[in-house]
C-alpha cells in the first residue's frame, strides 16, 4: 500500500507505541506531522490510519484543521463499542471496573490499563469527523471485518457527508487479506486525483 501511495507522494510510515491510550497516539501523530511540516513546509498532507490508528487520525484531523485529506482503513466509529465487541465480557467488565489486564501478543507481554477505555470517553468520533469538514475522506472497509464491524464505516461516511467516498469490499477481514492490492490501487487513484496540482 505504501508503495502504491508513493507513486503520487512521499510517504511517512510509523507505528504507535503499543497499548497506549488514544490521547498518547494522537500526541505521537501530531509530533510526526510537526516534523514533516518542519522538513517540507507547504507540503500537502494526507493522513491514513488503520483501525485504532484511523481513530487517532480522525481526532488529529479535527484538531489540526490544515490537512488536505484523510483515509480511514477499517476504522471504528465508536471506540467503546469496538472493544466491547472484541474482548470477552469478563475482560471488558474487569477493565471497565478499574482492573489492569495482562496478556501476550506479537509484541510480547503487555498490560492494558483502565485508562485505555476511559480515555475514549472524551472523543466523539462522528462529531470530530463533522468538525474536520470539508476535508475529503476515503473510507475503506471489508464487509466481514471481525474486529470493526462494517456498519461503523457506514456511520463514519454518514457523519462526513458529501466529502466521503465509501468503499466496502465484499467479504474480507480486518487486515484486508484478500483485498490489500485492490484497496491499495483505489487509494493510489484517490490520492492521485487530489494531488494533480502538485505536492511533495
Walk through the language-model features, giving the residues of each.
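Short beta-strand/loop motif that positions the catalytic acidic residue
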Residues: 132-133, 139-141, 145
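Short amphipathic alpha-helix adjacent to the substrate-entry channel of hydrolases
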Residues: 1-12
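Catalytic nucleophile-loop/oxyanion-hole region of alpha/beta-hydrolase
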Residues: 12, 16-42
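Short alpha-helix in the alpha/beta-hydrolase fold that links the catalytic acid
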Residues: 125, 149-158
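Catalytic histidine-centered segment of alpha/beta-hydrolase-like enzymes
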Residues: 172-184
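Hydrolase active-site cap/lid region
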Residues: 63-114
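Acidic catalytic loop of the alpha/beta-hydrolase fold
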Residues: 144-148, 175
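Alpha/beta-hydrolase fold nucleophile elbow
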Residues: 40-51
Amino acid at each position: 500500500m505504501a508503495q502504491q501511495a508513493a507513486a503520487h507522494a512521499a510517504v511517512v510510515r510509523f507505528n504507535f507505541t503499543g497499548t497506549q491510550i488514544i490521547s498518547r497516539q494522537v500526541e505521537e501523530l501530531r509530533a510526526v506531522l510537526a516534523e514533516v511540516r518542519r522538513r517540507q513546509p507547504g507540503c500537502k498532507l494526507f493522513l491514513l490510519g488503520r483501525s485504532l490508528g484511523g481513530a487517532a487520525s480522525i481526532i488529529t484531523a479535527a484538531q489540526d484543521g490544515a490537512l488536505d485529506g484523510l483515509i480511514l482503513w477499517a476504522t471504528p466509529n465508536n471506540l467503546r463499542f469496538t472493544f466491547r465487541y472484541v474482548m470477552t465480557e469478563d475482560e471488558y467488565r474487569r477493565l471497565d471496573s478499574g482492573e489492569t489486564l495482562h496478556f501476550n501478543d506479537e509484541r510480547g507481554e503487555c498490560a492494558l490499563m483502565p485508562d485505555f477505555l476511559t480515555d475514549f470517553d472524551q472523543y466523539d468520533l462522528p462529531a470530530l469527523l463533522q468538525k474536520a469538514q470539508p476535508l475529503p475522506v476515503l473510507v475503506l472497509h471489508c464487509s466481514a471485518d471481525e474486529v470493526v464491524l462494517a456498519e461503523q464505516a457506514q456511520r463514519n461516511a454518514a457523519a462526513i457527508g458529501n466529502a466521503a467516498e465509501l468503499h466496502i469490499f465484499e467479504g474480507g477481514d480486518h487486515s484486508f487479506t484478500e483485498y490489500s492490492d485492490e484497496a491499495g490501487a483505489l487509494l493510489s487513484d484517490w490520492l492521485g486525483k487530489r494531488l494533480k496540482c502538485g505536492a511533495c
